[in-house]
């Protein structure tokens, strides 16, 4: 059994994989991660735990206390891993959630793609058909954009709006603007990839805001639940110890 954990700024997502399928997947709010120890204690014991933590070192210490006894690997971004290569100037500075998502996307689709994680932040990363991470960008996520505008501009409505091509209410205008800004960043990255010789890149998108963005994108979209967990599983499978651990289950 492999337990994969994606510790983000808003949610801690986890999944237990038995080598053939996900036996369980769920999440808790990062602010309520004290519940995680009791939740994980009810699961079958894993042989290996693989973690992508972007919630900070203090949270990482708390997470360690919640983990069951097992070999544990804390992911670090590197120059090359699991079939992809990083063009980041300093590979170790790339967020481990982005690195895991890139690995997961390439293992699932093996094609040129804009790899998007729509969470608190929106990460938009370029992946070539031969597995090179060319670079990427980070912008505020839809909810963060919306809240920042409402909290820093006098007189704007607090009501959450809906998407519209031609918004005729302030709440709708804010929501539509945030969604269009996000989609514009994604589609622009796809165009950069095409200009670099990567024909018709996919958009592989995951995260809590993915369902808001996917219908508005003028790209071939692959919506993937828990892409970071898929990447962590790929990393576990590519690790010799992890392969032996999975075979024992």
What are these regions (language model features)?
Residues 1-23, 105, 111-133, 149, ...:
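Gly/Thr-rich phosphate-binding beta-strand-loop-beta motif of the actin/hexokinase/Hsp70
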Residues 1-3, 45-49, 112, 197-203, ...:
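Short active-site oxyanion
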Residues 11, 52-61, 176, 199-216:
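Glycine-rich phosphate-binding loops at beta-strand->alpha-helix junctions
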Residues 94-96, 100-103, 107-110, 134-176, ...:
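Glycine-rich phosphate-binding loop plus the immediately following alpha-helix
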